[in-house]
Amino acid sequence: MGRLHCTEDPVPEAVGGDMQQLNQLGAQQFSALTEVLFHFLTEPKEVERFLAQLSEFATTNQISLGSLRSIVKSLLLVPNGALKKSLTAKQVQADFITLGLSEEKATYFSEKWKQNAPTLARWAIGQTLMINQLIDMEWKFGVTSGSSELEKVGSIFLQLKLVVKKGNQTENVYIELTLPQFYSFLHEMERVRTSMECFC
């Protein structure tokens, strides 16, 4: 197997077999499954709806739900990696072909990827920003009055208190910085703000 764009990790053994099963699906079946998959990728919180759609697809196409879940897990390998690495539709297509999916189906999936890429990118950025949402920040300046290291006496330091939202809870994070570290941190925060304004 060739090198993949979406991951450097070894690919699970089941993936090759799952791709062969996907190749056996008719064009209409593959199209319907891809539609279900992109609904899930663009609205990942709708897990129950996704599982219900998979169950319905399995029943309609007389495929066991267990094998369909394995197929979908293998199929999600590329888009999940592609989101993390911002891959192009061509790279997504190449990865599916490398994994053993037929060129026709890989092309169809990559076209769908191209159509949904802006929505998926916005969602991925939103997820990244929601991991630890900064709610509030306070800082206090201080001067070192006593230290075992003579040159540190009289140096200015800064204590930061960050209020971070983790899930449904808030947590206080305390950081102590030297003045140069603080200015570097401030500079990075300005860069983040500028980047964020580009997306709004």
UniProtKB/Swiss-Prot annotation:
GO terms for molecular function: NF-kappaB binding. It comes from the Eukaryota. Component of the commander complex consisting of the CCC subcomplex and the retriever subcomplex. Component of the CCC (COMMD/CCDC22/CCDC93) subcomplex consisting of COMMD1, COMMD2, COMMD3, COMMD4, COMMD5, COMMD6, COMMD7, COMMD8, COMMD9, COMMD10, CCDC22 and CCDC93; within the complex forms a heterodimer with COMMD9. Interacts with RELA. Interacts with CCDC22, CCDC93, SCNN1B, CUL7. Keywords: Cytoplasmic vesicle, Transcription, Transcription regulation, Ubl conjugation pathway. PANTHER family: COMM DOMAIN-CONTAINING PROTEIN 4-8 FAMILY MEMBER, COMM DOMAIN-CONTAINING PROTEIN 7. Widely expressed with highest expression in lung. GO terms for biological process: negative regulation of DNA-templated transcription; negative regulation of NF-kappaB transcription factor activity; tumor necrosis factor-mediated signaling pathway. InterPro entries: COMM, COMMD4/6/7/8, COMMD7. Pfam families: COMM_domain, COMM_HN. Scaffold protein in the commander complex that is essential for endosomal recycling of transmembrane cargos; the commander complex is composed of the CCC subcomplex and the retriever subcomplex. May modulate activity of cullin-RING E3 ubiquitin ligase (CRL) complexes. Associates with the NF-kappa-B complex and suppresses its transcriptional activity. The gene is COMMD7. Residues 133-200 form the COMM domain. PROSITE patterns: COMM. One of its GO terms (cellular component) is cytoplasmic vesicle. This is COMM domain-containing protein 7. Belongs to the COMM domain-containing protein 7 family. It is found in: Cytoplasmic vesicle.
